[in-house]
């Protein structure tokens, strides 16, 4: 059997549809999806097997990254570092651009990325045929920069095989790096954490989801049930009250939604205990961010 394997960084502006694309390719709910921008904060490996036209069995290890953006906030700098690290670690990059985006995001990507890359135009189901053709034509001015230009829709599963075929074509023959049926090397507790964060984005408005994080203090994995004890961290007491809601209505909704998603992913019952605490300025202090697993690379003179 002929095998290929390789790491592919999935890069794009916030809300380009990176996590939706990966969940569709995996046919599973692993990556955090939200209509709000900048929901993804940390790097996640997602493993997609694919048999290409040349008969190679390819193991494509996608590196799902936070949206490519620049902000002064320390947390956002940590997120940008994750994307830059993924580009450095990968053999190949895929830049995902929404059909509604201008070209500035791609131009920024070109200034940062030294690796060969594929340009994928996402959300084509949300535009007319004329609009898609016009956007493809606009990107053609950069045709010397990318390996291929692939229009697709993750939501409608359009042209996804074309993307995988193109990726596989540019991977080198190699033994597989992970077990055959593995979808991610993430621990279940980390996947559960992201599911709780996703529920925060689903049920809370304004800045609260961006000024919150989740810590799983205790995780007990049993044969028939997983027991999860987690804290939702916010920055202000006023935010804590909103997360809990009157008579606990908000935290109940968040908890129920998260638990049902956990049970679907883990394929077993889940007991979920959620607490809410206020920790002033946690997203602005480097020590607090390090404790939560966020790091960033400082510029060197």
Curated annotation (Swiss-Prot):
GO biological process, one term: ribosomal small subunit assembly
Membrane topology according to the record: Peripheral membrane protein
G2, as annotated region: 38-42
Stretches the record annotates as G5: 152-154
Domain Era-type G: 4-173
Entry's Gene Ontology cellular component terms: cytosol; plasma membrane
Subcellular location: Cytoplasm; Cell inner membrane
Main location: cytoplasm
Entry keyword set: Cell inner membrane, Cell membrane, Cytoplasm, GTP-binding, Membrane, Nucleotide-binding, Ribosome biogenesis, RNA-binding, rRNA-binding
G1: region residues: 12-19
Gene3D superfamilies registered for this protein in UniProt: 3.30.300.20, P-loop containing nucleotide triphosphate hydrolases
List of residues binding GTP: 12-19, 64-68, 122-125
Domain KH type-2: 204-280
Molecular function per GO: GTP binding; GTPase activity; ribosomal small subunit binding; small ribosomal subunit rRNA binding
Region entry G3, spans: 64-67
Chain intervals for the UniProt region annotation (G4): 122-125
Role summary: An essential GTPase that binds both GDP and GTP, with rapid nucleotide exchange. Plays a role in 16S rRNA processing and 30S ribosomal subunit biogenesis and possibly also in cell cycle regulation and energy metabolism.
Family note: Belongs to the TRAFAC class TrmE-Era-EngA-EngB-Septin-like GTPase superfamily. Era GTPase family.
Matches recorded under PANTHER family: GTPASE ERA (PTHR42698), GTPASE ERA, MITOCHONDRIAL (PTHR42698:SF1)
Quaternary organization: Monomer.
Descriptive protein name: GTPase Era
The species this protein was found in: Helicobacter pylori (strain HPAG1)
Gene that encodes it: era
